[in-house]
Amino acid sequence: MSKTIMDVSRWQGTIDWDEVKASGKVDGVMLRAMGNSADGKVSKPYIDPQFARNYAECTRVGLPVGVYGYFKAVNREQADKELAYFKKLLTGRSFELPVAVDIEDEVQKPLGKAALTGLTAYMLSTVESWGVYALLYTGLWFGNTFLCMGGAALKPYDVWLAAYRTRKPAPGWPFGMWQYTGTARVPGVSTNVDMSHAYKDYAAIIKRAGLGAVKGV
């Protein structure tokens, strides 16, 4: 049986997490920790304004938490800067769900499949080295067009696939989570919200493996 996972960011405003928990509609939450205003030339990651509150509140009410960062890196130097910033945001916190690298930006398209796939694999392996369960987030069209999905470089990592439709997609490569809508409604959230099916019990897997806590260097 799949788990229902909600993901939120600053765009959902101030959430009443007691209401979310009481609704019984959500088994876990993916929080945006890092946004990005990079233009392809200069890396400009920033903390999502709601991240600290959302993390504290989810922890308080007992909702399993994962996190994602929006990456716009187009080379290794930018990737290292964004990764360092992302890790700083996560250090000292623990996550029951995966830590996702979000790859879907316009500035990354000109790199070509091979280069962007290699850069993405590098970012995922770095995140994994922090002692968390690394996950790739991307859209169905973006993944098929700009990444070598199902290839050797990305094969070690689960995919969180965005494809808004009523039937489960069949892209020809495996994925562990499916973000199926951006217009769900959940008590306690004043806006539409993204919702996903998780086909693995990530909380159990992460706990069993002793993963999830991000420590400083």
Predicted regions and their residues:
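Functionally critical loop-and-helix segments that line ligand-binding/catalytic clefts
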Residues: 1-19, 23, 27, 150-217
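Catalytic domains of cell-wall/extracellular-matrix polysaccharide-remodeling enzymes
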Residues: 97-171
